[in-house]
């Protein structure tokens, strides 16, 4: 019986080598196993050491047209895309049991996208003492950097990470080198690479950075010549621990730029990279006492320090200037009662376009109806056409008085223009726009008691800067900061947009706008435009369930998490969401303290 199996095994082996058919080889091995398991083991060693295996593999590759390029391998109609893991910047031990249970399915959901997927994990140990020595040296170098520049938040964050790694080693967790491949199977190159891209983005959402493998990396994997370079701890490998982390926005957006604060769950530093987003605007919504003004102040000051661009605060309650003094920051004080906006003077823009802008400013400031607004536009047009170089509000008042219109309408227009005249002196040598410095500027609106005139000042400054910086580039040149933004946003409608148009244009005007208000109703009828186009959207603590139900339209939240966590956010804690990415983050905001820079 044994001889029969040996004869069969030899015949099958010969057929397999001649025809390059793997089925015959497998059957031969099975036949040998029935004869004697030791024979099979000896044959396996012989097969691997001999040239037979090399000849077989070589001919199999030739016979089946294997193609290896960056990102994929093709064998006839079977295509495999290769993703390689670059970084796993987290630790699951920072999560609570409940958070871990909630997030456990995310990793598997990402893998389910690909249908059939293989994971290759290679691991090797490292010299712990040498690794520790390198960490101590790096920590020492970073401390020198921080001593020279105490405002360097990125260096502080890196030092914190190194100290955390040293602590892990001291607790007995051994680091190791690793390499991880995700292999996606498909029937075409296009489908394989497209699926790999979707998986890559899904992995990024749980904090895992990956990329398509290069051709030589795929070849090294197949030839078992891979060199392991990345170093991690056991608690950083989610695939072996069967868990996932919370979804996070694009890695490049939250790891560089303006320091916003620490993530509440894992205390990781969160940044806002204004240069990487398509829209440099921010809107913070929260009730009185939630900490939105402090955060807005911090955001504006940090933007000026980090990017070196002018920041203009509109100070409605005089609390901005008081807080800046309290924290020891120098700023330029600008009083619109002393520095004129010069609304009747314009440059860098066509006359007809500016007249439309001026009509929009006055219409939105005084909430004029269509008839009165159209009549005012006609009067402005005739006044400037009659007296282009010397037009004044007095001239326009005379024009209105001579106009053959309804007396009530005439009185209404005279009241509006007289109010504008009282504020807009039109003296060029004290021009408000020219008074704006390159640093921090505070426009004091607290001395203006009329909401209409406050809006006039803010709208006038916005339009003047839009015309000044209306150059086709993506560079951020100025940021306007508006606390109590409801004063502007409620007055806009779909036909006469100023702030909404600025926000929709993204970086187009070169102007960023940071705003804070108390609730969704403050945004007026254009609320969807503001919420859908804002680059950084923040929601602060609010016990109203209706409020959080509205938030769920713009952020990817589940009901349980909302009820258990968000309603009980403390002062200075906030849920943030970046544009075009519904994945939210809960942070403890970083605010100014005296000499914080």
UniProtKB/Swiss-Prot annotation:
Keywords, alphabetical: ATP-binding, Cell membrane, Membrane, Nucleotide-binding, Transmembrane, Transmembrane helix, Transport
Annotated Gene Ontology cellular component terms: plasma membrane
Consequences of knocking out this gene: DNA transfer is completely abolished in deletion mutants. Deletion does not reduce cellular aggregation induced by UV stress.
Transmembrane segments: 10-30
A Pfam entry, by short name: AAA_10
SMART domains found in the cross-reference section: AAA
UniProt-listed SUPFAM superfamilies: P-loop containing nucleoside triphosphate hydrolases
Chief location of this protein within or outside the cell: membrane
Protein name: DNA import protein CedB
Originating species: Sulfolobus acidocaldarius (strain ATCC 33909 / DSM 639 / JCM 8929 / NBRC 15157 / NCIMB 11770)
């Amino acid at each position: 019986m044994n001889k029969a199996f040996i004869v069969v095994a030899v015949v099958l082996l010969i057929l397999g080598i001649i025809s390059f058919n793997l089925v015959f080889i497998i059957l031969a091995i099975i036949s040998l196993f029935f004869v004697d398991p030791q024979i099979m083991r000896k044959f396996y060693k012989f097969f691997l050491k001999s040239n037979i295996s090399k000849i077989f593999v070589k001919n199999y590759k030739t016979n089946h047209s294997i193609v290896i390029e960056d990102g994929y391998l093709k064998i006839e109609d079977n295509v495999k895309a290769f993703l390689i893991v670059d970084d796993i910047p987290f630790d699951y031990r920072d999560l609570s049991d409940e958070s871990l249970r909630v997030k456990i399915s995310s990793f598997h959901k990402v893998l389910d996208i690909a249908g059939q997927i293989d994971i290759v994990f290679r691991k090797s140990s490292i010299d712990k003492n040498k690794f520790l020595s390198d960490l101590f040296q790096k920590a020492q170098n970073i401390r020198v950097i921080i001593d020279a520049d105490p405002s360097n938040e990125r260096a502080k964050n890196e030092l914190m990470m190194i100290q955390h790694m040293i602590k892990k080693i001291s607790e007995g967790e051994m680091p190791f080198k690793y390499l991880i491949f995700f292999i996606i199977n498909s029937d075409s190159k296009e489908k394989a690479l497209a699926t790999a891209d979707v998986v890559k983005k899904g992995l990024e959402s749980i904090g895992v950075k990956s990329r398509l493998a290069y051709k030589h990396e795929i070849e090294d994997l197949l030839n078992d010549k891979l060199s392991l370079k990345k170093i991690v701890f056991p608690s950083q490998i989610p695939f072996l621990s069967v868990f996932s982390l919370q979804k996070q926005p694009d890695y490049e957006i939250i790891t560089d730029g303006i320091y916003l604060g620490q993530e509440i769950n894992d205390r990781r530093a969160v940044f806002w990279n204004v240069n990487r987003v398509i829209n440099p605007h921010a809107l913070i919504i929260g009730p009185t006492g939630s900490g939105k003004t402090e955060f807005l102040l911090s955001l504006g000051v940090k933007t000026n320090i980090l990017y070196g661009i002018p920041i203009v605060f509109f100070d409605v309650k005089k609390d901005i200037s008081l807080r800046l003094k309290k924290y020891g920051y120098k700023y330029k004080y600008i009083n619109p009662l002393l520095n004129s906006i010069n609304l009747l003077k314009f440059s860098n823009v066509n006359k007809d376009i500016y007249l439309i802008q001026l009509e929009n400013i006055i219409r939105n400031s005084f909430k004029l109806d269509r008839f009165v607004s159209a009549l005012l536009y006609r009067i402005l047009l005739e006044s400037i056409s009659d007296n282009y170089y010397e037009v004044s509000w007095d001239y326009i008042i005379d024009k209105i008085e001579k106009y053959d219109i309804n007396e009530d309408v005439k009185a209404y227009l005279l009241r509006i223009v007289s109010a504008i005249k009282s504020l807009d002196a039109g003296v060029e040598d004290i021009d408000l726009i020219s008074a704006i410095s390159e640093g921090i500027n505070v426009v004091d609106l607290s001395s203006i008691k009329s909401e209409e005139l406050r809006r006039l000042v803010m709208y006038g400054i916005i339009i003047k800067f839009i015309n000044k910086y209306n150059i086709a580039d993506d560079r951020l040149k100025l940021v306007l900061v508006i606390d109590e933004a409801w004063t502007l946003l409620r007055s806009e409608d779909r036909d006469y947009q100023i702030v909404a148009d600025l926000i929709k244009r993204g970086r187009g005007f070169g102007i960023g706008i940071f705003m804070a208000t108390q609730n969704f109703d403050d945004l007026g009828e254009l609320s969807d435009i503001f919420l859908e186009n804002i680059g950084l959207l923040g929601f602060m603590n609010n016990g109203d369930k209706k409020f959080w139900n509205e938030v769920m339209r713009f952020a990817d939240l589940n009901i349980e998490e909302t009820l258990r966590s968000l309603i009980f956010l403390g002062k200075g804690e906030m849920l943030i969401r970046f544009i075009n990415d519904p994945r939210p983050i809960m942070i403890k905001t970083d605010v100014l303290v005296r000499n914080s820079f």
